[in-house]
Amino acid sequence: MSVFIDKNTKVMVQGITGSTALFHTKQMLDYGTQIVAGVTPGKGGQVVEGVPVYNTVEEAKNETGANVSVVYVPAPFAADSIIEAADADLDMVICITEHIPVVDMVKVKRYLQGRKTRLVGPNCPGVITADECKIGIMPGYIHKKGHVGVVSRSGTLTYEAVHQLTEEGIGQTTAVGIGGDPVNGTNFIDVLKAFNEDSETKAVVMIGEIGGTAEEEAAQWIKENMNKPVVGFIGGQTAPPGKRMGHAGAIISGGKGTASEKIKTLNDCGVETADTPSEIGTTLIDAAKKAGIYEELLTIKK
């Protein structure tokens, strides 16, 4: 089991003929992801990396049965691409694109209400179910199958956490990058809920950062609902107020969204936190030992 995607997921790439999309399409195919279609308006009929290109999402879905799309479309046009995927009733859209205007995302979020399409991102590394399906830009080789779910606002910190776990012999079920923008499609609680219901996931690593209140809300949800150990890390502990730290959503404003507030709330709700990125793996190991599941998590033969 896994969450959101698995080896049977059929993927289309929106914006497939762009250089970034082409590079990552090849990487995803090499990983074993079933990429069945690409979409670039006006380029229908072409074949790139062995993948047929269509003019519209609707056409690509009808011809290939694709149920998930990944968006590598430039920021000015990305919101329209997400809406087109939702109109075609895809199960999920994973948007990698950064710098989409906030007002565009507000419109997209409103448009998706009441529809079945789940949006992950934007400005995210994607979603990967280890050894089965990689959709996005993450390095595939560090992910190994196991029992730890990872959810994160940061791409590179996800890779750091996963690499540490793999080095310790601890595999993962699915890693979900929810993205660093202030308005996104899937939040921490959505992913935690999925991990909580997934029989294969035995523990969770949650990586947040300064800005907003998503981590505090997730902490409260964990306290009330989660029946598996969760450990956390919050990026931006030395960030000054009012300065954006990399991501559009990573900003302390109005005295809210500080790392210390988030860490305190997580700790109060029973979530152990790592002080530095390099301690994420050992923090999970400590929590797993306390919960008596450490041996179960050792799925990688060294």
Swiss-Prot record:
Gene this chain is encoded by: sucD
Q: How does it assemble?
A: Heterotetramer of two alpha and two beta subunits.
Q: Name one GO biological process term.
A: tricarboxylic acid cycle
The root-end lineage is:
Bacteria, Bacillati, Bacillota, Bacilli, Bacillales
Q: Name one Pfam family in it.
A: Ligase_CoA
InterPro entries in the cross-refs = Cit_synth/succinyl-CoA_lig_AS, Citrt_syn/SCS-alpha_CS, CoA-bd, CoA_lig_alpha, NAD(P)-bd_dom_sf, SUCC_ACL_C, Succinyl-CoA_synth-like
SMART domains cross-referenced by the UniProt entry? CoA_binding
Q: What is this protein called?
A: Succinate--CoA ligase [ADP-forming] subunit alpha
Q: Which NCBIfam families match?
A: PRK05678.1, sucCoAalpha
This protein's GO cellular component annotations are: cytosol; succinate-CoA ligase complex (ADP-forming)
UniProt keyword list: Ligase, Nucleotide-binding, Tricarboxylic acid cycle
What Gene Ontology terms describe what this protein does at the molecular function level? Answer: nucleotide binding; succinate-CoA ligase (ADP-forming) activity; succinate-CoA ligase (GDP-forming) activity
Indicate yes or no for the key word Nucleotide-binding. Answer: yes
Membership in a protein family? Belongs to the succinate/malate CoA ligase alpha subunit family.
The entry marks the following residues as binding CoA, namely T17, G18, S19, T20, K43, I96, T97, E98
Q: In which pathway does it act?
A: Carbohydrate metabolism; tricarboxylic acid cycle; succinate from succinyl-CoA (ligase route): step 1/1
Identify the domain of life: Bacteria
Cited function: Succinyl-CoA synthetase functions in the citric acid cycle (TCA), coupling the hydrolysis of succinyl-CoA to the synthesis of either ATP or GTP and thus represents the only step of substrate-level phosphorylation in the TCA. The alpha subunit of the enzyme binds the substrates coenzyme A and phosphate, while succinate binding and nucleotide specificity is provided by the beta subunit.
Q: Which residues bind substrate?
A: Y159
Root EC class: ligase
The organism named in the record is: Staphylococcus epidermidis (strain ATCC 35984 / DSM 28319 / BCRC 17069 / CCUG 31568 / BM 3577 / RP62A)
The Enzyme Commission number assigned here is: 6.2.1.5
